[in-house]
């Protein structure tokens, strides 16, 4: 039985981390083997707080050993990683990706390098950003950073579309074959912008921006998951990006229309199979937009 190994956070209530990523990939036809880096009652933006705990790096490695014992790693089509709770967890992920690639050289590694955002800066524990930037992102086939995380990896500030394109080119030169910028903040507050870059070209995706009273949590995890599933379907990065962008819009639209804070992943599940709205991609090059 082939599958996707997804190593990231988990919440019992709502949709963030694996709780946001696992079902969409299953709905798109893939078996998913989730390993949780933390397990919380709910996401951490609730003013009432949350309960739960982080797992150790040894917890992750132990589960991977068990999967290896039953021959699962050679059937692993992709490793998807998101939020890591410690520097040690990052090292366990690095070891896991290496083992999976040894067992199945065709397996993809998709790294969502959760570090922070422009308005918050780096929000992860000491050592995590360094391991993401120096170990996990360079070994990944695909990285899915936001603008802040891309700027950290490319070691440059991003203020314009040209900056973003150059940063993606720098990122591609460091090892990844595909860069999907899950949120490009610098262009406009009127639209939500994403960017895809490969050696073959760079594409900009724009969709309407929703004025949520409180921004939903877990949308980035959703983006990474749908894109991963699209690539495993044999779609080109551009095709997977198009589907991912349209499907995520559908989920966010359903969430907005329902007046909910938590992503309406279950109610909007048809979006993962057949998105209800299409937003054409724009191929961009340097100096396309000043």
UniProtKB/Swiss-Prot annotation:
Pfam families: Phos_pyr_kin. It is an enzyme of class 2 (transferase). Pyridoxal kinase involved in the salvage pathway of pyridoxal 5'-phosphate (PLP). Catalyzes the phosphorylation of pyridoxal to PLP. Substrate binds at residues 9, 44-45, 221. Belongs to the pyridoxine kinase family. PdxY subfamily. Keywords: ATP-binding, Kinase, Magnesium, Nucleotide-binding, Transferase. InterPro entries: PM/HMP-P_kinase-1, PyrdxlKinase, Pyridoxal_kinase_PdxY, Ribokinase-like. This is Pyridoxal kinase PdxY. GO terms for biological process: pyridoxal 5'-phosphate salvage. The lineage of its organism: Bacteria, Pseudomonadati, Pseudomonadota, Gammaproteobacteria, Vibrionales. It catalyses: pyridoxal + ATP = pyridoxal 5'-phosphate + ADP + H(+). Its cofactor is Mg(2+). Its EC number is 2.7.1.35. GO terms for cellular component: cytosol. SUPFAM superfamilies: Ribokinase-like. Pathway: Cofactor metabolism; pyridoxal 5'-phosphate salvage; pyridoxal 5'-phosphate from pyridoxal: step 1/1. One of its GO terms (molecular function) is pyridoxal kinase activity.
């Amino acid at each position: 039985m082939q599958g996707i190994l997804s190593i990231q956070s988990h919440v019992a209530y709502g949709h963030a981390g694996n709780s946001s990523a696992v079902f969409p990939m299953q709905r798109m036809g893939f078996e998913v083997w989730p390993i949780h880096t933390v397990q919380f009652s709910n996401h951490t933006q609730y003013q009432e707080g949350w309960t739960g705990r982080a797992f150790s790096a040894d917890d992750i490695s132990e589960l991977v050993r068990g999967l290896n014992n039953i021959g699962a790693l050679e059937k692993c089509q992709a490793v998807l990683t998101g939020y890591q709770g410690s520097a040690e967890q990052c090292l366990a992920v690095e070891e896991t990706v290496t083992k999976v690639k040894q067992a199945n050289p065709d397996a993809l590694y998709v790294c969502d390098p959760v570090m922070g955002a422009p308005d918050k800066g780096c929000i992860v524990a000491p050592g995590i950003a360094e391991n993401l930037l120096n170990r996990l992102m360079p070994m990944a086939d695909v990285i899915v950073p936001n603008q802040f995380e891309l700027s950290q990896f490319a070691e440059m500030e991003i203020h314009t579309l040209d900056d973003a394109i150059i940063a993606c080119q720098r990122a591609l030169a460091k090892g990844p074959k595909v860069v999907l910028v899950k949120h490009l903040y610098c262009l406009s507050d009127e639209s939500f912008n994403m960017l895809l870059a490969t050696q073959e070209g760079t594409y900009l995706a724009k969709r309407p921006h929703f004025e949520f009273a409180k921004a939903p949590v877990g949308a980035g995890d959703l983006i990474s998951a749908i894109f991963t599933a699209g690539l495993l379907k044999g779609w080109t990065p551009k095709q997977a990006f198009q589907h991912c962008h349209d499907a995520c819009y559908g989920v966010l639209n359903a969430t907005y229309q329902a007046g909910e804070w938590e992503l309406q992943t279950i109610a909007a599940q048809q979006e993962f199979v057949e998105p209800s709205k299409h937003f054409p991609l724009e191929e961009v090059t340097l100096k396309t937009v000043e």
